[in-house]
Every structure is written in structure tokens, then in C-alpha cells.
A protein has these predicted regions:
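Feature captures hydrophobic
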Residues: 2-139
Length: 139
């Protein structure tokens, strides 16, 4: 429980593969859910992270009270984020404003440039994408 009494959702690691990084993403999601339980509890949807490197995609499903993170793809996710792993990670370390990277900071401008230049593609539910960035934010 947090100081305001909110319990985080149950974050579970699902199927993993030899070429997957679901366990690493799981750690980020678990940390984010513990830090921002209200946000994690209100999120709903299927998210897929696809990497240009020879890595398995990571899929996340946010349901009532449960988040599952595992290696694998969705046929039709609500949100798909794709790009090179370091470029996708850059989105999680950029300071945010309004759920998007803050253009007033160097890291924020760098992350936005990766999206604007097509190095990172965000397809689908943009509101879910903003919530995911807030959940995964390192700071």
C-alpha cells in the first residue's frame, strides 16, 4: 500500500524466450506500478514493444488489478512502440511533461527527435502511450 492507501496491481511475468527481454521490462513495470499504483490500476489495454535488434517483442496486458509482461507479439495491440532498444529506452529516461518527453530538456528533445524522425514509431492509442511513459519513467 502507498501513503494514500492505494495498492498496486499484481504484476506478473508471463512466458519468456531465450531471445527476450520481458524480465527486464517486467522490472520496470513492477517498479512503476509500486511508485504510481493509481496510474497502473487505471490502465487498460494491450501493448507491444518491438525492437529492431534480434530480440523477441514484449507484450504487456493491463487488466483490472493485473498486469502481465511476457515475450511475444499481439495480432492487434492497442499500442505498438517499435524501434532500436536504446531509442525505446530513451523514452523512459526523458523527463516528462503532460505524459510526453519534455522539450525543455536535452533528454526530452532527444527522445522527441527519435519519434519525430521515425527512429521510434508509436502506433495506436496515444493516450495509453502517455500513461505507459509515465508508468515507466525512471524519474
Amino acid at each position: 500500500m502507498t501513503t494514500n492507501g492505494s495498492a498496486p496491481p499484481d504484476v506478473r511475468l508471463g512466458a519468456t524466450s531465450d531471445d527476450g527481454i520481458a524480465a527486464s521490462i517486467f522490472a520496470l513495470v513492477e517498479r512503476g506500478a509500486a511508485r504510481r499504483p493509481e496510474l497502473a490500476m487505471e490502465m487498460r489495454g494491450r501493448i507491444e514493444l518491438c525492437f529492431a535488434e534480434d530480440l523477441a517483442p514484449v507484450r504487456l496486458v493491463f487488466e483490472e488489478g493485473v498486469v502481465v509482461v511476457e515475450d511475444g507479439a499481439w495480432d492487434a495491440p492497442d499500442l505498438r512502440i517499435s524501434g532500436r532498444l536504446p531509442h525505446v529506452v530513451a523514452l523512459t529516461v526523458a523527463p516528462l511533461v503532460g505524459g510526453v518527453p519534455n522539450p525543455a530538456t536535452v533528454r526530452g528533445r532527444s527522445a522527441l527527435a527519435k519519434v519525430a524522425g521515425g527512429a521510434v514509431r508509436v502506433e495506436g492509442d496515444r493516450a495509453l502511450g502517455r500513461r505507459l511513459l509515465r508508468l515507466l519513467a525512471i524519474r
